[in-house]
């Protein structure tokens, strides 16, 4: 099951990137975390949990660049059914 600890650990290497301009590709260890998170979130419940964890972490992170955050998965070549934004409705995630 996906927990907020799993999400935080997976996305930890992305934090510096997510506070920047997104002018350079995300670091390899950040994309590895994104891929592991996608692999871990196999069920709708897992994906909703991951979404809620990312949303609350994003709200607590000062100077997070939401434009960069929204593109993170695609920059890493990963298809996600939702993006990180302050008003994403995690209950609608399939």
UniProtKB/Swiss-Prot annotation:
Q: Which UniProt keywords apply?
A: Disulfide bond, Lipid-binding, Transport
The source's domain of life comes to: Eukaryota
Q: Does the keyword Disulfide bond apply?
A: yes
Family annotation (SUPFAM superfamilies): Bifunctional inhibitor/lipid-transfer protein/seed storage 2S albumin
Q: Function of this protein?
A: Plant non-specific lipid-transfer proteins transfer phospholipids as well as galactolipids across membranes. May play a role in wax or cutin deposition in the cell walls of expanding epidermal cells and certain secretory tissues.
PANTHER family the UniProt entry points to:
NON-SPECIFIC LIPID-TRANSFER PROTEIN 2-RELATED
This chain's protein is named Non-specific lipid-transfer protein
Q: Lineage from the top down? A: Eukaryota, Viridiplantae, Streptophyta, Embryophyta, Tracheophyta
